[in-house]
């Protein structure tokens, strides 16, 4: 449906006209955001060229999203509930073949790092005395994990120092210990200096990790009806911290998001659910 009249002179377009266009435009959210950005830039240019005195597009707002049941279900599928997490980790820890995968998965649940950041951690990045880990890089997949080439993190916000919980310290120390054992007992072990590695010393690949958790899920009596990838453990931390009233800014700082739509969605969803539970409790008093 075409609602923006391109024959209009730019000085005749006001904020109400642009607002009506945004409200009536039948487009996806991403397209609507793009249209708004184009309008902002167009009218900014017109102001700079002195065709108009101010930018009406800046006063118009994107219409609020109306959440559907499908939207809610999609958000809930981005993180694991406590019982789902326990069942999956128990299965990963059950066999030697996936034990290392279980340790890495649990570490990400507590730390919130991306898998590329986790497998780039070296012992020298960890300060056990101060209980912190320095997230300063990710592994470059283009040259292959076996070469262990470390590059910078995804964004400036991703470059961070993260406090370590008791469980994270236990996991890191256990991984370092089993790596030492592998190094002394396996001829194939290639010591590339990373913590989260396979029994042969190569950093755990994202694809291998995802396949392992997918197969572990399939072995469960009641498989989890969610798309399981390494991201779900990071998102699970966001939901757990939100449930425990951690500020959004603090959560974003820990997981390394400068501005994440997914983090916001999960945080908003969980806190809204908590508000609803409070109302149910009050109604039952």
Segments (PLM) and residue ranges:
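Basic/aromatic-enriched alpha-helical hairpins
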Residues: 1-28
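Short, basic (Lys/Arg/His-rich) helix/loop patches that form interaction surfaces
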Residues: 6, 90-101, 162, 178-187, ...
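Hydrophobic (often cysteine-bearing) scaffold residues that line and stabilize catalytic clefts
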Residues: 14, 31-39, 100-101, 168, ...
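Basic, Lys/Arg- and aromatic-enriched nucleic-acid-binding interface segment
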Residues: 29-37, 48, 52, 58-121, ...
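C-terminal flanking helix
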Residues: 40-43, 47, 217, 271, ...
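Conserved tyrosine-mediated DNA breakage-rejoining catalytic core shared by Y-recombinases
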Residues: 62, 120-177, 181
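Short, polar N-cap/turn motifs at the start of nucleic acid-interacting alpha helices
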Residues: 125-132, 246-266
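DNA/chromatin major-groove-contacting recognition/catalytic segments
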Residues: 144-151, 244, 265, 269-285
